[in-house]
């Protein structure tokens, strides 16, 4: 596991102490300059971290340390839907986000760069109506509201999505 925050790594050690083995390492590092050899990893997973580094540097570092035929999986927020942009801006005004993070939030342009770099790339979009899921679940139950949300994810344009998942395979 890597993180730029030593405190975050300590929290992970505590939360997952029952699952740790000697092969699991915790390394404090910057994702823009990973301290690993070229072609070192078969799989890299990133959850919500793309907006915390220079997009171009992060893309190149992930590609560099991933083995040929290795897989990069990321889940993150998409910064295209105006509702979510306003929400993120309100968090910025409250001091919960930095301006640089807002500028680096993943968008379609960044997703195209990943697709171009990796070649073999699957992108799944979801959460177009996530903002209504909780209130709706109070009336029709979580399972039914989730079905409606999934249906709209398939019907609505991708720019309305809240989240995306990339599954990219490195092919030299």
Predicted regions mapped to residue ranges:
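A conserved beta-strand element that flanks and buttresses the S-adenosyl-L-methionine
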Residues: 45
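Conserved class I S-adenosyl-L-methionine
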Residues: 73-96
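Short alpha-helix
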Residues: 101-123
């Amino acid at each position: 596991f890597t993180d730029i925050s030593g405190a975050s790594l300590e929290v992970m050690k505590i939360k997952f102490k029952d699952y740790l083995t000697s092969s699991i390492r915790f390394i404090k590092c910057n994702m823009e300059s990973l301290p690993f050899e070229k072609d070192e990893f078969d799989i890299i997973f990133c959850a919500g971290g793309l907006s915390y580094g220079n997009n171009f540097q992060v893309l190149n570092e992930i590609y560099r340390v991933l083995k040929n035929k290795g897989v990069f999986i990321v889940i993150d927020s998409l910064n295209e839907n105006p509702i979510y942009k306003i929400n993120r801006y309100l968090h910025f005004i409250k001091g919960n986000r930095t301006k640089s993070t807002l500028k680096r939030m993943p968008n379609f342009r960044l997703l195209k760069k990943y697709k171009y770099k990796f070649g073999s790339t699957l992108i799944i979009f979801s959460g177009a109506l996530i903002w209504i899921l909780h209130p709706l679940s109070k009336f029709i139950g979580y399972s039914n509201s989730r079905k409606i949300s999934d249906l709209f994810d398939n019907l609505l344009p991708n720019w309305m999505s809240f989240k995306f998942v990339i599954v990219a395979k490195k092919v030299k």
